[in-house]
Amino acid sequence: MKVLVFDIWGDLAHFKRFYTTSSPLTFSFPPPTTIKGILGAIIGCDKEEYIDVFSRDRCKISIQILKPIKKIRLGLNYINTKGNFWRPTKHGKHEARTQIPAEFVKNPYYRIYVSHKDGKIFDRLGEYVKSHRTFYTVSLGLSELLADFRYAGVLEFMERVEGEVEISSVIPISALTEGLVFKEGNRYFKERIPVDMNQDRIVLKYEDVLYESQGNKILAKVRGFWEGEDGSCIYFL
């Protein structure tokens, strides 16, 4: 199977966790639902179209962390727009601005693996990424957090039934057969992320995943992984 590989990075990223309220927290990496939006922005799919174009039954996505995850908190200034207009000064009990603390990933750097059943869409995506072109501006979660990307290649991947290997990407917990081999210095974390949603932005599937926050590979016995011609092993979400 042909897989497009490219790197994406920026100064800051914010992928809002679905279970946070007034003080937004971020996932450590972009979940598949966010990556689909990035892919749609690259080739020009609008917000109503990209969910279908990159649906889970047509598109496979894998995420690799390339640099250590560092999180910081910054204040976001929200303006008061009640009544459908902005008051630049305090009015009654309503301040002109409200500062909300939010969590961000600092200097995020990821590698994205993408495969698509539709050869035309796959080739178009590869052409845009290789020539460093986009139809819409690409960002990392929020429109203000601009992203840059770089083409890494198109590789052949073969599916493997089972084995003890070093996985480069984020791994679903359900793929582990006998746990993992802990290495000194590695930092392992688990998160529950959305992996699929419908046109109404209703999440159809969540997945508990394992990742190593320093960007190191995870040695584990897993089933259903994919091995590339360069020897890299990944798991599609």
Identify the residue ranges that each predicted region occupies.
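N-terminal, Lys/Arg- and Ser/Thr-rich interaction peptides
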Residues: 1-20
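Extracellular structured ligand-interaction cores
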Residues: 3, 58-60, 107-111
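Residues in well-ordered beta-strands of folded domains
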Residues: 7, 62-64, 113
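Generic preference for well-ordered secondary structure
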Residues: 13, 19-23, 47, 92, ...
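A broad, structure-centric signal for solvent-exposed, well-ordered loop/edge residues
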Residues: 13-15, 36, 112
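Glycine/small-residue-rich interface belts in oligomeric ring/scaffold proteins
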Residues: 17-86
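Internal, well-folded beta-alpha domain core
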Residues: 66-237
